[in-house]
Amino acid sequence: MLGRLPMGLAGLAILLYVQSGTASFAVAGLISAVYMLGVAGIAPLIGRMIDRIGPRPLLILCALVYPAALVALVVLVEHAAHTGWLALAALVGGAVLPPITICIRTLLPRMLQDADLLQTAYSVDSILIESIFVAGPALIAFFVALEFRAGAVLFAAACALAGSVLFMRTPAIRLWPRPTAYQSRGLLGPLRNRRLSMLYMATVLYSTAFGVIEVAIMALATAQGRPAAGGVILALASVGSGIGALVYGSRAWAMPPQRQYVIAQFAMALGLFALAPVTHLVWLGVLCVIACSPMAPVIALQSVLVARFTPPAMLAESFTWAATALLGGVSLGIAVGGLIVDYQSPFAAMLAAGVSTLSAAALSAVALSAAAATEEKTAAAESAL
């Protein structure tokens, strides 16, 4: 948990800290987006290296460089450095975010052969991640209340260092399977798989909404003179998402996961459209608990489908491409959200988030329905034997 806390902390902390130093949501959105782009851009290479040499060398490297990059970003903001230098520090920091989540999600299908258990495990993991996204904004709100926004960025750096050290001492890492003989998989690797490619494209679309939502809610709270409330509302959104994952993971579903994935995305889009006209911060927080409940199930189902569509020797790289799609979408959403709230309104930004998620659902419905139908026919044929 400690080593994964920067996932729910660093991007938003950078956004608010840079905004306080530059007085611009557009610049802050750009720097936060560059950070997320660094995470997303290097992830496939990290995954390929994990498949090839195991996770320990990369965890050591990231545990050292990531805190240094975030400290450098704070120093640059304090000295009013050029935006280009801020972007460079953010890019390096994002590129070396410790790959703890990728390691965990790669281990799960190797440890659990039963499909229902794997679905439950990914749901539990999504709940843990959502708890991180609850704790992250809450901690940011604490630092904002103290008028020490840099503290949130520095705290993320410390968590990454301490968490990586602790994770490397766990039995799962010590007992990581010895990598098999390396097999060439080409430059694109998992992207050559059509189903995975379509899954990644849908992920970019719905995760763009995540980034837009962050900026829209923080901008709305800031405009009303209560920036700390924005962090609380985002934490409530994560609570709702975690409840959704708990409900989803508590039972076995007869419906194929491809169709579950599409339905969850449609539900998420409807929730975002419902939030768009709400401007009262208390009601927005309450409604976020309900409207955001499909978010974690969408992410859990994405992991189930990646594990289902991927050969075992390529699991880490496939999950890092999934992370690239997810974080790349968040990065795009933060940048676009910053522009929309600067030139339009938080209402327009929330509508854009809903449209992006609805597009993801439509793409998934077209791209994955054929795969679901094929699996149903195969299962029916096997049961008839």
Q: Language model features by range: what are they?
A:
Residues R169-T208, L385:
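Juxtamembrane intracellular "pre-TM" segments in multi-pass secondary transporters
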Residues Q258-Q302:
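C-terminal transmembrane helical hairpin of 12-TM major facilitator-type secondary transporters
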